[in-house]
Amino acid sequence: MILTVTMNPSIDISYPLDELKIDTVNRVVDVTKTAGGKGLNVTRVLSEFGDSVLATGLVGGKLGEFLVEHIDNQVKKDFFSIQGETRNCIAILHGDNQTEVLEKGPEVLEQEGQDFLEHFKKLLESVEVVAISGSLPTGLPVDYYASLVELANQAGKPVVLDCSGAALQAVLESPHKPTVIKPNNEELSQLLGREVSEDLDELKEVLQEPLFAGIEWIIVSLGANGTFAKHGDTFYKVDIPRIQVVNPVGSGDSTVAGISSGLLHKESDAELLIKANVLGMLNAQEKMTGHVNMANYQALYDQLIVKEV
């Protein structure tokens, strides 16, 4: 079983409009509300793929109750309740544009943060792999993910970590390392304080920087150009076919689902990388975020090429 962790989930509200009119009333007919957050996208894709998954994280108030109720019934869930209210994230879809209004979310009390560590520690007993995704809510220390990774390491459970900014920096500077990180070029540039290109020789050098020491897997998305990966001392390039992109949002989360599944099933390097890329591409072909059509899985799988570089 895979444990997905979403520390700052949301109710994702979509308002489709033909035109967004400023400084007046906009009436919406077709409103959708879903349980949102990067970790919950991972959860949905794992469930659709057929892997056993347990979802956890922080929820609060009536919106927190709504969120838990609107996670697929096939998914096991064990969220931790806090005093603050789970946030809303609003997407206004107008024409070919999208305007987002994102609430900051609840402020987590220090004791709630400590109590969740105990909750997380207990959940580790029933899972084989951990996937941690997304931002930290206000109130938790910047190195909170390092604390989760430390507990998972002590329990012998591999961790796939998908976060960015100060939270990722804190983990990389910690002695407690996740098994996998999944930065993109922009995030690599931010971490190192210099521009990082997609040149493979440069990426090889970058991923051997001291900052990344101790990370078993580093998987870098190159968008339409595929993926570059480092596993131990071995480097890989994944070539992918061109596809019709409908909605790329959530493709990174779907990739995390594939990585986690590959670890769960102890797949070879090539199998893990292909699965991760295929699930990311399948998400991009769908209108709904964090959704894959498994009927198209094998046809895409057969087109990917993994080569050692």
Curated annotation (Swiss-Prot):
The protein's Enzyme Commission number: 2.7.1.144
EC class:
transferase
MF GO annotations:
ATP binding; phosphofructokinase activity; tagatose-6-phosphate kinase activity
> Known InterPro entries for this protein?
Carboh/pur_kinase_PfkB_CS, LacC, PfkB_dom, Ribokinase-like, Tagatose/fructose_Pkinase
Q: What is one GO cellular-component annotation here?
A: cytosol
Taxonomically, the superkingdom here is Bacteria
- Could you tell me what reaction this enzyme catalyses? D-tagatofuranose 6-phosphate + ATP = D-tagatofuranose 1,6-bisphosphate + ADP + H(+)
Span-the-membrane segments of this chain are none
Q: Which UniProt keywords apply?
A: ATP-binding, Kinase, Lactose metabolism, Nucleotide-binding, Transferase
Pathway connected to this protein: Carbohydrate metabolism; D-tagatose 6-phosphate degradation; D-glyceraldehyde 3-phosphate and glycerone phosphate from D-tagatose 6-phosphate: step 1/2
GO BP, sorted A to Z:
D-tagatose 6-phosphate catabolic process; lactose catabolic process via tagatose-6-phosphate
A Pfam family this chain is assigned to: PfkB
Concerning its family, UniProt says:
Belongs to the carbohydrate kinase PfkB family. LacC subfamily.
- PANTHER family associated with the record: 1-PHOSPHOFRUCTOKINASE, 1-PHOSPHOFRUCTOKINASE-RELATED
This protein is called: Tagatose-6-phosphate kinase
Q: What species is this protein from?
A: Streptococcus pneumoniae (strain 70585)
